[in-house]
Amino acid sequence: MANNKSAKKRIQIAERNRLINKSYKSTVRTLTKKTLENCEKYKKEPNDENKNLVTTSLNKAFSLIDKAVKKNVLHKNNGANRKSKINNFVKTTLTTK
């Protein structure tokens, strides 16, 4: 248990930041899953509309991963690995017909 005022405040700040970071990570996971789902949808029914869905969801996922790295929620290598994994999946999906 914290004994002085500054230590108590640091506990509150750490908890607040933990919740914010958790939210970022959750959103990154959600957008990644959405991108992969859109890729599967494109595989089943390749058309321009589904291709646009894949590219827009990919851009959103990349943007959020970059923001998470910028705010030190994710390590830069972790962010790069996530982007690489998503991009490889999308690339194989869009090139395979």
From Swiss-Prot:
Q: Which organism is it from?
A: Prochlorococcus marinus (strain MIT 9301)
Q: Which NCBIfam families match?
A: S20
Q: Which Gene3D superfamilies match?
A: Ribosomal protein S20
What PANTHER family does the database record attribute to this sequence?
A: 30S RIBOSOMAL PROTEIN S20, SMALL RIBOSOMAL SUBUNIT PROTEIN BS20C
Gene name as annotated:
rpsT
HAMAP family cross-referenced by the UniProt entry:
Ribosomal_bS20 (MF_00500)
Which GO-annotated molecular functions does the record name?
small ribosomal subunit rRNA binding; structural constituent of ribosome
* InterPro entries in alphabetical order: Ribosomal_bS20, Ribosomal_bS20_sf
Q: What is this protein called?
A: Small ribosomal subunit protein bS20
Record family assignment: Belongs to the bacterial ribosomal protein bS20 family.
Q: Which GO terms describe its cellular component?
A: small ribosomal subunit
